[in-house]
From Swiss-Prot:
Its main location: membrane. A lipid is attached at residues 474, 478, 482, 485 (S-palmitoyl cysteine). The keyword Transmembrane applies. Residues 479-501 are cytoplasmic. Residues 75-416 form the Peptidase A1 domain. This is Beta-secretase 1. N-Glycosylated. Addition of a bisecting N-acetylglucosamine by MGAT3 blocks lysosomal targeting, further degradation and is required for maintaining stability under stress conditions. The modification Phosphoserine is found at residue 498. There is a cross-link at residue 501 (Glycyl lysine isopeptide (Lys-Gly) (interchain with G-Cter in ubiquitin)). The gene is Bace1. The modification N6-acetyllysine is found at residues 126, 275, 279, 285, 299-300, 307. Residues 22-45 form a propeptide. It catalyses: Broad endopeptidase specificity. Cleaves Glu-Val-Asn-Leu-|-Asp-Ala-Glu-Phe in the Swedish variant of Alzheimer's amyloid precursor protein. It comes from the Eukaryota.
Length: 501
C-alpha cells in the first residue's frame, strides 16, 4: 500500500486492505433487462502489436498461476528468505516500496521470519516505521538472501524490514505474512536510500527491468464452498506472457517514478462523459496499485460517477449505504442482473502525442463478491468504488479485468484484456484506441513546489512577527517585576513599623 497506504489495501486511503466486517445484506428482486448500450466508436488505427524486446521471449510457464489470495484481501506470492530457506506468503503491492515480513509472533500469523535461524541475515542496525491511514507497522532493517520458487531461478540479497510490532496491518485468514513493495525507491521507508527488492533483483541478475500482473478475481461458482472463495493470478518477472491476454497491449507513460503514476484524461459511465476538468481526475495523483482493493476516486469525481451509475441502474433501488460501501446487496444465487449496471471507461494518456486509449471496466469488477456472508441461496456484493483524499487509485478490482505490464525500463504501463477476467455473454472488458485527445499534459496535477529562498523569506517574516508580539510582552514583564520589587520594599518597611509599635 503507499507508504500512505490505506489499510493495505484494501483500505481506502493508503493502500491498506479493508477490514472484514459483518454487513447487512439487502435482498433485491431480479428484473429482466437488456444489455447495456454498445461501446462508443473509436478512430481507425494501425495494428498496435508490441515490439519484442530482449528478455521478453521465452517461456514463463513456471510463473503462471503463482499468485493466490482471497477476495478483498490481496494477492500473494510464495517467497523464501534466509539460509536455510524459510517459506512465507508475501502480498504483492505495486503501491509501496518496502519488502517487509512478520518477524514476531502475531495472532493472525501461522508462521513468521525467524532471523536468528538464518546464517545469512545481516542486521543494518536501523529501525523503520510505516503508518497508514488506518494501521501501522514498525520493525528493524536488515538484509538476507531471497528467492521466489515459482519465479526466476535466482537468489538475491535484498533489504528486509523485520516487522516486530503492528496494528491493523495483518488480516485474519488472509494467509500472507509480509508485503512486497514493487514501486520505486522515492517512497521507500525510512528514506529513498533503501533499495527496493525489484531494484536489487535487476541489479544483481540479468533479468530485464519489467514485470507483469494478471489478477483473476473471484466470481461466484455454481458449487460454492469456502475453498472456492480464493482468487488466483500470475506475476511474470522479467517479461510478458502472451498467453495471459487477448488483443493488443496499449501503453501509457509513467508520469513520475515514485508510485506507478499515470494520467487519466477522461471518464465515462456507459459512454456518457462526466465532462469534468481532467485535472480533477488526477488530483493529486492517479496510480496503479495492486495493494488497494477498490477503484478510489477524488471526492468530486466520485460524487459525479456515483450519480451517473445510480441513474443508469435506476431500475433497481439501492440503499445509500450500498453506494458508500457500508451495505451489501444480495440476489438469489446465479441471478445477479449485471445488465442493469453500466460500464465505467477510463481514458489514459497514450504514448503518441494527442492520442489516448480507454479501458472499459465491467460491473463484474466494481461489484466485489463477498463470500463470507453469502449462502448457497444468495450472491452478495459490495460496491468497490470509493472516495479518496489522495487521488485516483486503480486498485485490484480494476486490474482484475486486465493484464497489466509494468515496463520500468521504458517508463510505461501496458494494459490488455485479461484472458481470465469475469464477464457475461453481453459484455467483456475492453482496451481500445486510439482516440484524439488534445492538451493531455495539462491533465496532470502538479503539486506546488516552494523553493528554499521563498521558505527563508517566510521564516524571516514569521520571526519578525513573533518579535513584534514578544516585545510588548517583555516590557509588561519588566514593568511587573519592577512594581513587585517596589511593593516588596514597601511591605518590609510596614512590617518594621509594626514591630516598633
Amino acid at each position: 500500500m503507499a507508504p500512505a497506504l490505506h489499510w493495505l489495501l484494501l483500505w481506502v486511503g493508503s493502500g491498506m486492505l479493508p477490514a472484514q466486517g459483518t454487513h447487512l445484506g439487502i435482498r433485491l428482486p431480479l428484473r429482466s433487462g437488456l444489455a447495456g448500450p454498445p461501446l462508443g466508436l473509436r478512430l481507425p488505427r494501425e495494428t498496435d502489436e508490441e515490439s519484442e524486446e530482449p528478455g521478453r521471449r521465452g517461456s514463463f510457464v513456471e510463473m503462471v498461476d503463482n499468485l493466490r489470495g482471497k477476495s478483498g484481501q490481496g494477492y500473494y506470492v510464495e517467497m523464501t528468505v534466509g539460509s536455510p530457506p524459510q517459506t512465507l506468503n508475501i502480498l504483492v503491492d505495486t503501491g509501496s516500496s518496502n519488502f517487509a515480513v512478520g518477524a514476531a509472533p502475531h495472532p493472525f500469523l501461522h508462521r513468521y521470519y525467524q532471523r536468528q535461524l538464518s546464517s545469512t541475515y545481516r542486521d543494518l542496525r536501523k529501525g523503520v516505521y510505516v503508518p497508514y491511514t488506518q494501521g501501522k507497522w514498525e520493525g528493524e532493517l536488515g538484509t538476507d538472501l531471497v528467492s521466489i520458487p515459482h519465479g526466476p531461478n535466482v537468489t538475491v540479497r535484498a533489504n528486509i524490514a523485520a516487522i516486530t510490532e503492528s496494528d491493523k496491518f495483518f488480516i485474519n485468514g488472509s494467509n500472507w505474512e509480509g508485503i512486497l513493495g514493487l514501486a520505486y525507491a522515492e517512497i521507500a521507508r525510512p528514506d529513498d536510500s533503501l533499495e527496493p527488492f525489484f531494484d536489487s533483483l535487476v541489479k544483481q541478475t540479468h533479468i530485464p527491468n519489467i514485470f507483469s500482473l494478471q489478477l483473476c478475481g473471484a466470481g461466484f461458482p455454481l458449487n460454492q464452498t469456502e475453498a472456492l472463495a480464493s482468487v488466483g493470478g500470475s506475476m511474470i518477472i522479467g517479461g510478458i506472457d502472451h498467453s495471459l491476454y487477448t488483443g493488443s497491449l496499449w501503453y501509457t507513460p509513467i508520469r513520475r517514478e515514485w508510485y506507478y503514476e499515470v494520467i487519466i484524461v477522461r471518464v465515462e459511465i456507459n459512454g456518457q462523459d462526466l465532462k469534468m476538468d481532467c485535472k480533477e481526475y488526477n488530483y493529486d495523483k492517479s496510480i496503479v496499485d495492486s495493494g488497494t482493493t477498490n477503484l478510489r476516486l477524488p471526492k468530486k469525481v466520485f460524487e459525479a460517477a456515483v450519480k451517473s451509475i445510480k441513474a443508469a441502474s435506476s431500475t433497481e433501488k439501492f440503499p445509500d449505504g450500498f453506494w458508500l460501501g457500508e451495505q451489501l446487496v444480495c440476489w438469489q444465487a446465479g441471478t445477479t442482473p449485471w445488465n442493469i449496471f453500466p460500464v465505467i471507461s477510463l481514458y489514459l494518456m497514450g504514448e503518441v502525442t494527442n492520442q489516448s486509449f480507454r479501458i472499459t471496466i465491467l460491473p463484474q469488477q466494481y461489484l466485489r463478491p463477498v463470500e463470507d456472508v453469502a449462502t448457497s441461496q444468495d450472491d452478495c456484493y459490495k460496491f468497490a468504488v470509493s472516495q479518496s483524499s489522495t487521488g485516483t487509485v486503480m486498485g485490484a478490482v480494476i486490474m482484475e479485468g486486465f493484464y497489466v505490464v509494468f515496463d520500468r525500463a521504458r517508463k510505461r504501463i501496458g494494459f490488455a484484456v485479461s484472458a481470465c477476467h469475469v464477464h457475461d455473454e453481453f459484455r467483456t472488458a475492453a482496451v481500445e484506441g486510439p482516440f484524439v485527445t488534445a492538451d493531455m499534459e495539462d491533465c496532470g496535477y502538479n503539486i506546488p513546489q516552494t523553493d528554499e529562498s521563498t521558505l527563508m523569506t517566510i521564516a524571516y517574516v514569521m520571526a519578525a512577527i513573533c518579535a513584534l508580539f514578544m516585545l510588548p510582552l517583555c516590557l509588561m514583564v519588566c514593568q511587573w517585576r519592577c512594581l513587585r520589587c517596589l511593593r516588596h520594599q514597601h511591605d518590609d518597611f510596614a512590617d518594621d513599623i509594626s514591630l516598633l509599635k
